[in-house]
From Swiss-Prot:
One Pfam family it belongs to: tRNA-synt_1g
PANTHER family, sorted: METHIONINE--TRNA LIGASE (PTHR45765), METHIONINE--TRNA LIGASE, CYTOPLASMIC (PTHR45765:SF1)
The protein's name: Methionine--tRNA ligase
Superkingdom per UniProt: Bacteria
Native source species: Roseiflexus castenholzii (strain DSM 13941 / HLO8)
Binding-site residues, Zn(2+): C144, C147, C157, C160
HAMAP family assigned to the protein according to its UniProt record, in alphabetical order: Met_tRNA_synth_type1 (MF_00098)
Reaction equation(s) it catalyzes: tRNA(Met) + L-methionine + ATP = L-methionyl-tRNA(Met) + AMP + diphosphate
Motif ('HIGH' region): 12-22
Cofactor(s) essential for the protein: Zn(2+)
Length: 592
């Protein structure tokens, strides 16, 4: 029976376009992982969507004098365009502004309330005297009490990741007008994390330390070490999921965004199932089996600033609800810097995805963001390094290997040649191919994407060396049988590398698949469909049918006699002049 895999990906606020840090931090790693499991033939569901209730959206709406829905309709389509351009293959990328999400969130709230894991309590809320209203946490900024960062948000510090309440900040102020905030009492519902703490601790102790990343465990253990306390799940807001209780005091309050956003993984799975015509299919990924075990392995791809929400709060909600599968792994990535400096949207020091997705081949961007990805430590986008690695690794190593082998074969044989007797050199490359296939498989199973990509590229280097030593371009003139054997071995290595690179480089892998004489698709791409939002206006989702790639993860069995198509280069060499051009673009737009 094939494995069942849930790939749950962080929900971005629909208040601005993606920069490359977002892509490297969650969306591209998730896509590589999902594509790999589909190639294995595993039942794979990859879901996410635009977080429509985040405070940044309401801030943008208030500043522009428009509605939150207007902000969402401006930026949600840009997400879909970027995902299509880069081949991010969601089974469903939706929104939290849907009837389905409101229904699932309401059910989660009521079940937790029924099971005794929610309670009411009066708390102190941030209040603007100048505006005469309560302020959401992210409408408040101040100095972080933990690290001293001067622009910490009311709920979390972007610098150190510390979670806190607005009243913990030093000199808190409103982001709307800069005025100091005061604090008033207001009643809200709380998630009883203290009551759930014993079960959470037992779960954390049960996870396999061999695959959870060290930083993910450290963040989680530090939270538990401090002890858990109740966390408010409602706020004095006008925009969001209504609080489903018959209490006039909560008529003008809404469910807090951090609570409803994580439910999105669950609600998106339900929406996907309904869209496929099998409304109960989501249960295959979520509902525990009769023995209490999970029906699937659930992987949550996020940035490190979201670790506590996915290793403490969301698991607590799942435990409190009952009979829903807990995360199997939370591969949280670190941050991607830009030219040695932390990206800053306020300073516009960022490399925005829409700015580069049309200027460079998608596989060049994908390659660099994985090869240089922030898996276990912060990494850095450098234009000089981007050009150097694309040219020396993607073009001169892998692209050159594929082009040389196909060109010589097509010119001299027109098809995959019939091999003769193998030599030790042939057998060594065949063995290296087998070993690399096994090691890349194991690394991808463990979500070690950088290492897996490096192993595949190392095999391409080995195959290039084999070609240089065997010189088939000379052999074709005086020893056709030996030339045929060398090219056959090289073609099968290239064919296997096509598969190994496919999760990382789907566009060029599909092209190579066709050049090698295959029909069909090994790298299906997503597409946009239209549905309807709760306000009756059109709503766009990203989806796709990826079944065509199932079972393609295997060592090459490329048969002799299969026609080879006239090859063209898979990748474009980059002119070094673009380094200065791109750096100039960055400096021209930065705000000091």
């Amino acid at each position: 029976m094939p494995d069942t895999i849930l790939v749950a990906v962080a929900w971005p606020y629909a208040n601005g376009p993606f920069h490359v840090g977002h892509i490297a931090g969650a969306y591209l790693p998730a896509d590589v992982f999902a594509r790999y499991h589909r190639l294995r033939g595993h039942r794979t569901l990859m879901v996410s969507g635009s977080d429509c209730h985040g405070t940044p959206i309401t801030i943008a709406a208030e500043r522009e004098g428009i509605t939150p829905q207007d902000v969402i309709r401006r930026y949600h389509p840009t997400f879909l365009k970027t995902f299509q351009a880069l081949g991010i293959s969601f089974d469903l990328f939706t929104q939290t502004y849907t009837d389905n999400h409101y229904r699932v969130t309401t059910d989660m709230f009521l079940r937790l309330l029924e099971n005794g894991y929610l309670y009411k309590e009066t708390m102190v809320g941030s209040y603007s005297e100048t505006l005469g209203r309560f302020l959401p946490d992210r409408f408040v900024e101040g100095t972080c009490p933990n690290c001293g960062y001067p622009r910490a948000r009311g709920d979390q510090c972007d610098s150190c990741g510390h979670l806190h309440d607005p009243q913990d900040l030093i000199a808190p102020r409103s982001v709307l007008d800069g005025a100091p905030v005061t604090f008033r009492e207001t009643e809200h519902f709380f998630l009883d994390l203290a009551k759930l703490e014993p079960q959470l601790r037992a779960w954390i102790e049960s996870v396999d330390r061999s695959y959870w990343r060290a930083n993910t465990l450290l963040f989680t253990q530090n939270w538990l070490r401090e002890g858990l306390r109740g966390r408010a799940i409602t706020r004095d807001l006008e925009w969001g999921v209504p609080v489903p209780v018959d209490d006039p005091a909560f008529k003008d309050k809404r469910i807090y965004v951090w609570f409803d956003a994580v439910i999105g993984y669950y609600s998106a799975s339900v929406e996907w199932a309904e869209r496929t015509g099998a409304p109960d299919a989501w249960k295959d990924w979520w509902v525990c089996l009769p023995d209490g075990s999970a029906p699937a392995r659930s992987y949550y791809f996020i940035g490190k600033d979201n670790i506590p929400f996915h290793t403490i709060i969301w698991p607590a909600m799942l435990i409190g609800y009952g009979n829903l599968a807990l995360p199997y792994d939370v591969p949280a990535n670190e941050f991607l810097n830009l030219e040695g400096d932390k990206m800053s949207t306020s300073r516009n020091w960022a490399l925005w995805a829409p700015e580069i997705e049309d200027r460079y081949q998608p596989d060049a961007i994908r390659y660099y963001l994985i090869a240089n990805g922030p898996e276990t430590r912060d990494s850095n986008w450098s234009w000089a390094d981007f050009v150097q690695r694309v040219n020396s690794e993607l073009v001169a190593t892998w692209g050159n290997l594929a082009n040389r082998v196909l060109s010589i074969t097509h010119r001299n044989f027109g098809a995959v040649p019939q091999p003769g007797e193998l030599t030790d050199a042939d057998r060594q490359l065949i063995a290296a191919t087998q070993q690399t296939f096994e090691s890349v498989t194991a690394l991808l199973d463990g979500v070690k994407l950088r290492a897996a990509l490096s192993e595949a590229m190392a095999l391409a280097q080995t195959a290039n060396q084999y070609l240089s030593e065997q010189e088939p371009w000379k052999l074709v003139r005086h020893d056709q049988e030996r030339a045929a054997t060398v090219l056959f071995v090289a073609l099968r290595t290239v064919d296997t590398l096509k598969v190994l690179f496919c999760p990382f480089l789907p566009f060029s892998s599909q092209r190579l698949h066709e050049l090698l004489g295959y029909t069909g698709t090994i790298a299906p791409q997503p597409h946009v469909e239209e549905t309807t939002a709760p306000d009756g206006l059109p709503r766009l989702v990203l989806t796709g049918d990826y079944r065509a790639s199932a079972g393609a993860w295997r060592i090459s069995v490329l048969p002799p006699g299969q026609p080879i198509q006239p090859p063209t280069p898979l990748f474009q060499k980059l002119d070094e002049a673009i380094i200065a051009e791109e750096l100039a673009r960055l400096r021209a737009k930065v705000r000091l």
